[in-house]
A protein has these predicted regions:
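Short, solvent-exposed loop/turn segments at the edges of extracellular beta-sandwich modules
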Residues: 21-25
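Mature extracytoplasmic or organellar-lumen-exposed domains after removal of signal/transit peptides
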Residues: 18-20, 33-35, 39, 66-204
Length: 204
């Protein structure tokens, strides 16, 4: 896990404390200190409303957080599905419906991968491809995170587009996960080998 990052702190007074952690307990070292963060105001483009700027940046941070978490969930679901595919081949009691559901989930995950990452088959042919959610959000994040200027109209519009696309993709991701859980339950009833993400059950 990387170190936490975020937008610049607002000007004002802050309190800092130094502590040592030992055996799970924190012990403060010395008294707390107050320090002041001052704006540089070195450019005419610096925002006159830093609180509003930070509010926008924090919204971008949240969308970035959800995007990264969704991508990890997507990859985890792909891994679960790969193990389920192998489990089906080793379980005679599975049905045609299980195989059909696996194929459906595989296609839905592939479509979600395009939504998040873009279509590499198009870009590899040097053709213009729609921007994936992850690329759009990453661009907004790095262009705004440490900026001291008010976000422009294009930045706000791009944020709203990314947020809308992410909401739709997240809804689909949850729906596919529900279908994946149902497939895992079906294979468990058929006596399939253990697969990641599934706790086996004892027979009655």
């Amino acid at each position: 896990m990387s170190d936490p990052t975020g937008p610049l702190a607002l000007p004002g007074d802050y309190t800092a404390r130094l502590a040592v952690e030992r055996d799970g307990e924190l012990t403060e070292v010395g008294p707390s200190r107050i320090f002041r963060v001052k704006p540089l105001n070195a450019s005419s483009e610096i925002s006159g409303d830093r609180r509003a700027l930070q509010a926008f940046q924090l919204k971008v941070v949240d969308v970035q957080r959800v995007t990264q978490g969704s991508l990890r969930s997507l990859n985890e679901m792909k891994n679960r599905l790969a193990h389920l595919r192998e489990a089906i081949t080793r379980t005679p009691a599975t049905s045609r419906e299980d195989e059909d559901m696996l194929s459906t989930i595989q296609q839905r995950l592939a479509d979600l991968s395009v939504d998040f990452n873009g279509d590499s088959t198009v870009s590899s042919r040097n053709e213009a491809a729609p921007l994936g959610i992850a690329s759009r959000v990453s661009s907004i994040y790095w262009n705004s995170m440490y900026s001291q200027s008010d976000p422009g109209g294009n930045a706000r519009k791009s944020y709203e587009i990314a947020k809308g696309e992410l909401a739709e993709a997240l809804s689909e991701l949850r729906a596919v996960n529900d279908q994946l859980v149902a497939l895992e339950a079906s294979l468990e009833r058929s006596g399939a080998p253990w697969t990641p993400g599934r706790i086996p059950k004892l027979p009655d």
